[in-house]
Each structure stands twice: as structure tokens, then as C-alpha cells.
């Protein structure tokens, strides 16, 4: 069955952590944008793995192709800028970025660690505006479960997403809900990237939700993110 195939894939890739890479030019990018939290290390790392690892190459994205990307979780816009700078060059390519700009539980637990929370949307929109393909990005402000019906109305029942990037709230319920709502919108052969899969709560939410319905073709764990080809 598809479920057992998925479980088999998971056990196969779970412990095979990819090499961590440092990317030249990171400093230059850091000067270009304003990011208080992390940089787009995890995505750069995943990108490197997909382009160099023999298993990863089956999942690698061709930069020049037309694609519809949807990301859940913008925060300061780091991942948004990554997609904009590297994967939106085709004139037809588009990115929809979803975030309520409220921060999530882990931020509210220790607000002193996250001074950017007060100006999150402003910081994010400022960063996105500086990115290479800013004009192809639509930021939808709201919680992913409330944006979902709007996207269903707009796009209909057929799968329409080429790349889904899931980096919203990290509790297992939110992760599972984002997975169950949005993964069916991904085209066959499309990619789903789960950030923070190395985090036990995220892993639990993803595994449970994907086991419930998904027919995944292949998957790879890149050290912190899980990339699944549908």
C-alpha cells in the first residue's frame, strides 16, 4: 500500500543526514537583507544536497522552470527571499506566501529573544521587496487554515502547486493540519519541503499526517529539512 511505501521511505532516509554545507556569498546576502533569526541556511543546505547527493538529484529543482510555489510561514521573509532569488526567474513563476505575522508559541514564550516580533510584517515586506523577483510574490496575511478556503475557491479542485514549503507553527497539530490541507494541492511530481523536520514535534505531525493519505514517490532528509516528492 501507499502508506507502507511511505513508512519504508521514511525509515530509509530518516537517519541519513546529509553533509552540512557553508555557502559562499552568505555574508553578502546577510548584508542585503535584515534577518534577526537564522538565515536561509537550511534551504541553502537542502538546495546543495539536492544538487550534489545521488538520491537528492532525483528531487532537485531546475531554476529556469515555470513553477507555482506556496510557502506557509514567512516570519522575516528569509525563505521567501530564497525562493525569489533562486527559483522564480521564469516569467510565469509565482510564489504565494502565507503568514499571520503574529509569531508563534515558541516566540511568545520568550519574547525578549525575539525583538523583531513587534515589526514582523514590516521587516518581512521590506526584505521581500529587495528580493530578485519581488513582483511575482503575493503575501497573504492570515493563518494558513483560514487562507486555505480562499485558495480552493481561486484554484479549484485540481492540484496546482509545484513546490510547497511548510514552515508554520511547529506544534504537531498545526503541522499535521497544514500537511493535510495543503499537500493534496501539490501536483504529482511536485515537491513538499518540511522545515524543522529535525524537531520532534514537527516530525510527529508530519509523519502522522503523511501516513494518513500521501502517496510519496521518494523522500530525503537533508539534516534539518525533509523533502518529499509526490
Where are the model-predicted features located?
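A short alpha-helical cap/connector motif
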Residues: 1-230
Amino acid at each position: 500500500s501507499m502508506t507502507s511505501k511511505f513508512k519504508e521511505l521514511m525509515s530509509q532516509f530518516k537517519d541519513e543526514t546529509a553533509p552540512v554545507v557553508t555557502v559562499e556569498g552568505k555574508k553578502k546576502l546577510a548584508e542585503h537583507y535584515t534577518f534577526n533569526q537564522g538565515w536561509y541556511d537550511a534551504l541553502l543546505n537542502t538546495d546543495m544536497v539536492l544538487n550534489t547527493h545521488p538520491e537528492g538529484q532525483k528531487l532537485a529543482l531546475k531554476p529556469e522552470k515555470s513553477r507555482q510555489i506556496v510557502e506557509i510561514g514567512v516570519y522575516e521573509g528569509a525563505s521567501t527571499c530564497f525562493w525569489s532569488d533562486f527559483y522564480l526567474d521564469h516569467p510565469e513563476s509565482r510564489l504565494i506566501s502565507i503568514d499571520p505575522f503574529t509569531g508563534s508559541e515558541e516566540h511568545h514564550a520568550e519574547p525578549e529573544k525575539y525583538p523583531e516580533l513587534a515589526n514582523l510584517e514590516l521587516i518581512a515586506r521590506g526584505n521581500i521587496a529587495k528580493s530578485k523577483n519581488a513582483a511575482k510574490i503575493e503575501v497573504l496575511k492570515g493563518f494558513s487554515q483560514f487562507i486555505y478556503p480562499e485558495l480552493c475557491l481561486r484554484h479549484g479542485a485540481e492540484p496546482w502547486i509545484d513546490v510547497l514549503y511548510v514552515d508554520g507553527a511547529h506544534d504537531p497539530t498545526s503541522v499535521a493540519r497544514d500537511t493535510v490541507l495543503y499537500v493534496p494541492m501539490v501536483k504529482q511530481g511536485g515537491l513538499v519541503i518540511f522545515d524543522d523536520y529535525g524537531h520532534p514535534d514537527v516530525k510527529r505531525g508530519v509523519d502522522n499526517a503523511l501516513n494518513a493519505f500521501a502517496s510519496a514517490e521518494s523522500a530525503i532528509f537533508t539534516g534539518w529539512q525533509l523533502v518529499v516528492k509526490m
